[in-house]
Amino acid sequence: WDGRRVHLPLRCTVRGEAFGQPDCGTDMVFDFAQLIAHVAKTRDLEAGSIVGSGTISNVDRSKGSACIVERRTLEQLDTGKPITPYLDFGDTVRIEMLDNDGRSIFGAIEQKVERLA
């Protein structure tokens, strides 16, 4: 954390396979001070408010992706067709960020795609 951006990788897995580890601060267009200022123009913010920065991606493609649509678009541009499948019933997505000592910052978020009953 540099006061405006978190500079750690977001570990993303899809179907139990590594999908990406983009660095959250690298290539971030708007820092959190700018995001909070913008959000505060249209609503009250209180302690505990959560402000999201949108999807995370890096210019350096070797870091992988945190967004299936972004990856499919890059594949379309590179090869003429998307390769990565969309999520299907039974698929699991997991994201987690670890600090420099390997401790989870916010706990892993893991969700499974299931049919509504």
Region spans (language model):
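Catalytic-pocket segment enriched in acidic/His residues
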Residues: 1-117
